[in-house]
Amino acid sequence: MTKKIGGLTAVNKVNLEIGDDQIVGLVGPNGAGKTTLLNIISGITPPTSGKVSFCGEDITGMKPDRICRKGIAKTFQIAESFPDLTAKECVMIGVLFGNDTAPGMKEAQSQALSILADVNFPLEKAETLNRNLNVVELKRLQLARALASRPKLLLLDELTTGLNPKESKEAVELIRKIRDTGISILIIEHVMSVIMGVSDRIVVLDHGEKIADGRPYEVVNNQQVIDTYLGDFNAF
């Protein structure tokens, strides 16, 4: 896939394959093209060239809502939600409109509460307006809303941003739990301990180009990756 924005090539001939029940970590410096790549896959922005195939079907150019119904859901870097809806109502939107088989309202409410519980959202705040939730709660709500569409592939854009180490560890455990339900995951993270802790493979982008793709410890010992990215991290 290639994406050009004006005179900038944000993503340059990147090939990426995600297997069943696999967690793929996507890392790279700021401006490397990571979020743009997720936006291409989810239909938010079309590629300039190349195509996106999902479950054997070419979904290039489909609108985001249709791609969601095909089985791809996405969370966003900034945890925002409809401020005047409750947490439960927000997840119900995903249950009712995120796929082609919508249940009745009573069942949608039940499913929404179950999904909120699955992501460790405090159920005593299920009727709280989203404007009154804290960052951790908004992150979990955003994840619940994505899961409500029953995706086969989940795209996570910096899920742990704004979380403390304990909360990040809980997020890692939750990501593994989601994968164990049969959902493949493509995750962008700057926290290398998170990426190393959850990923089956790590893909590294730099200036829109893929410079590495392999098992976590192969990638972090790749000299080009160290020079362009990991050199900034004392942990390595």
Placement of each model-derived feature along the sequence:
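Glycine-rich phosphate-binding loops of nucleotide-dependent enzymes
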Residues: 1-236
